[in-house]
């Protein structure tokens, strides 16, 4: 069934796909409300995370994305706000055992995470081990029912058909979003990848663009081509760029 769905999606892509913006423009509030203000650096300190959370509150970002060890701290810093706490699982390689990813997700939610960004097993995807990839994602989704799960497909390592397969499997496995990149690979988000991913998953799933998004113009372009969320460590700079353009 999985292989059939992938082949069906590839055939549809070959016949009907057209690269064009999903919307004509995006304003500063569209960008602000899409940003997941991110610090996943291996040398991030508690003070860095406190600063990240303060900036997210002040700028009314959608959320913060932090390493698992800082979920509890971020939850405390954001108490009483609408800012979501997002963390990562199987990060950044995606090569952990499935049960490890599932337990990581459980512990993250117990610590206060609202959303989970898990890394797909890139090697198994490239080997066309569809069932493995499906079960890997499904196990995380099932382990934290009721929480949003995003699947990082690491587009920089995939060809077009592999990107399509990753999106199809993520959707079948019950994930809520597909995400372009970890930010630790050889490349980040592109409008072309974002558009393809949204075209494949449709309106039933979201797309998170992440990796290399540093300016207001970058963020607007990603949203215009289908991104629902923006993962970036440059959230403040991005919003300041929008304010300079539009005022306030």
UniProtKB/Swiss-Prot annotation:
What the entry lists under Pfam families is as follows: DeoC
Write one Gene Ontology MF term.
Answer: deoxyribose-phosphate aldolase activity
Checking CDD domains in the record gives: DeoC
Residues annotated as transmembrane: none
Q: Which residues form the active site?
A: 117, 179, 208
- The domain of life is Bacteria
Which pathway or pathways does this protein act in?
Carbohydrate degradation; 2-deoxy-D-ribose 1-phosphate degradation; D-glyceraldehyde 3-phosphate and acetaldehyde from 2-deoxy-alpha-D-ribose 1-phosphate: step 2/2
Name any GO cellular component annotation.
Answer: cytoplasm
Name the UniProt key words of this record, in alphabetical order. Answer: Cytoplasm, Lyase, Schiff base
Q: Which GO terms describe its biological process?
A: 2-deoxyribose 1-phosphate catabolic process; carbohydrate catabolic process; deoxyribonucleotide catabolic process
Q: Which InterPro entries does the UniProt record give?
A: Aldolase_TIM, DeoC, DeoC/FbaB/LacD_aldolase, DeoC_typeI
SUPFAM superfamilies from the xrefs? Aldolase
Reaction it catalyzes: 2-deoxy-D-ribose 5-phosphate = D-glyceraldehyde 3-phosphate + acetaldehyde
Localization: Cytoplasm
Entry's EC annotation: 4.1.2.4
This molecule's function is given as: Catalyzes a reversible aldol reaction between acetaldehyde and D-glyceraldehyde 3-phosphate to generate 2-deoxy-D-ribose 5-phosphate.
Q: Which PANTHER family match?
A: DEOXYRIBOSE-PHOSPHATE ALDOLASE
Return the similarity comment: Belongs to the DeoC/FbaB aldolase family. DeoC type 1 subfamily.
HAMAP family, alphabetically? DeoC_type1
Q: What is this protein called?
A: Deoxyribose-phosphate aldolase
Q: Which organism is it from?
A: Thermotoga petrophila (strain ATCC BAA-488 / DSM 13995 / JCM 10881 / RKU-1)
């Amino acid at each position: 069934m999985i292989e059939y769905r992938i082949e069906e999606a590839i055939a549809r892509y070959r016949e009907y796909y057209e690269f064009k913006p999903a919307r004509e423009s995006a304003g500063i509030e569209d960008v602000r409300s899409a940003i997941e203000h991110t610090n996943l650096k291996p040398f991030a300190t508690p003070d860095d995370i406190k600063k990240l959370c303060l900036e997210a509150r002040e700028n009314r970002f959608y959320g913060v994305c932090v390493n698992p060890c800082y979920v509890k701290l971020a939850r405390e810093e954001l108490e009483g706000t609408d800012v979501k706490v997002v963390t990562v699982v199987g990060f950044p390689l995606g090569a952990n055992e499935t049960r490890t990813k599932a337990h990581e997700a459980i512990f993250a939610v117990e610590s206060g995470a609202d959303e989970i960004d898990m890394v797909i097993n890139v090697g198994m995807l490239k080997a066309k081990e569809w069932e493995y990839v499906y079960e890997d994602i499904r196990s995380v989704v099932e382990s934290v029912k009721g929480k949003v799960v995003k699947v990082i497909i690491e587009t920089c390592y995939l060809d077009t058909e592999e990107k399509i397969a990753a999106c199809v499997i993520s959707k079948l496995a019950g994930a809520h979003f597909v995400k372009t990149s970890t930010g630790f690979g050889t490349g980040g988000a592109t409008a072309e990848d974002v558009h393809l991913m949204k075209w494949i998953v449709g309106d039933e799933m979201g797309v998170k663009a992440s990796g290399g998004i540093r300016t207001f113009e970058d963020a607007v372009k990603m949203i215009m081509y289908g991104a629902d969320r923006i993962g970036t460590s440059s959230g403040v700079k991005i919003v300041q760029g929008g304010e300079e353009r539009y005022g306030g």
